[in-house]
Amino acid sequence: MRILITNDDGINAPGLEVLEQIALELAGPEGEVWTVAPAFEQSGVSHAISYTHPMMIAKLGPRRYAAEGSPADCVLAALYDVLQGARPDLVLSGVNRGNNSAENVLYSGTVGGALEAALQGLPAIALSQFLGPETEGLADPFECARTHGARIVRLLLERGLWDGEDYRLFYNVNFPPVPAANLRGHRVAAQGFRRDTSFGVEPHMSPSGRRFLWIRGGAQQSPTLPGTDAAVNLEGFVSITPLRADLTAHDRLAELEALIG
């Protein structure tokens, strides 16, 4: 098996090392693991692509590259340059430092990397490690993802749904904020929504008198509706959410047509 991995936390992020370990276990001794990851932090860039300026790319070692671009850029760089046409069997993005549940899905560069792979017709999975009070004292905050990641990916490869639609199905996996031994299992869960925890701004003044703003997110420990992704994560379960890039509100098409068609 040939596996391509990327992330949004950058080439030196600890979560990427976790994903490399997961990918090597899945690929086996006869397989290949290729890493093409951002040279710098790209958290929050979603599915951005850098088509207005050139993307520098550097080979760091065997099958290991850093690109000065987003996770989606890295997937494109891998498919159309680094791999020289040898398409991967699977694309993994992560393991993100922090959850990509609920509304975070829309901002996540980790999800954006998997989304681009899906648009390119490839099986893709985004993986993230929810952090919280129970992970703060761990020597390895990624312990849950490191221990259970390969098993969850293998489960999806062997028993998950995969299709060839134009907006191809891909998966968003979040590991709960618990030690590996405390994992309660996994749940298929819809994307949730944390009320009153959306992004906002925090104003400041520089020593020179210039006003500046920090973008700040809301409380990540707020649960979503029962059975949705963040809710099951906070209950100690891995959440597995099938996604598509198609943002059409299909449940409203007929109603809107009746009103204005």
Swiss-Prot record:
Manner of cofactor binding, per the entry note: Binds 1 divalent metal cation per subunit.
Keywords assigned by UniProt, alphabetized: Cytoplasm, Hydrolase, Metal-binding, Nucleotide-binding
EC top class named in words: hydrolase
Catalytic activities: a ribonucleoside 5'-phosphate + H2O = a ribonucleoside + phosphate
Entry's Gene Ontology cellular component terms: cytoplasm
Cofactor(s), names only, from the UniProt record: a divalent metal cation
Species the sequence originates in: Cereibacter sphaeroides (strain ATCC 17023 / DSM 158 / JCM 6121 / CCUG 31486 / LMG 2827 / NBRC 12203 / NCIMB 8253 / ATH 2.4.1.)
InterPro entries reported for this sequence: SurE, SurE-like_Pase/nucleotidase, SurE-like_sf
Gene Ontology MF terms in the entry: 3'-nucleotidase activity; 5'-nucleotidase activity; exopolyphosphatase activity; metal ion binding; nucleotide binding
Function: Nucleotidase that shows phosphatase activity on nucleoside 5'-monophosphates.
Main location: cytoplasm
Pfam family, one: SurE
Keyword check for Cytoplasm: yes
Compartment(s): Cytoplasm
Domain of life of the source: Bacteria
Keyword Kinase: no
Protein known as: 5'-nucleotidase SurE
Gene3D superfamilies in alphabetical order: Survival protein SurE-like phosphatase/nucleotidase (3.40.1210.10)
Residues reported in the UniProt entry to bind a divalent metal cation: D8, D9, S43, N96
Assigned protein family: Belongs to the SurE nucleotidase family.
EC number: 3.1.3.5
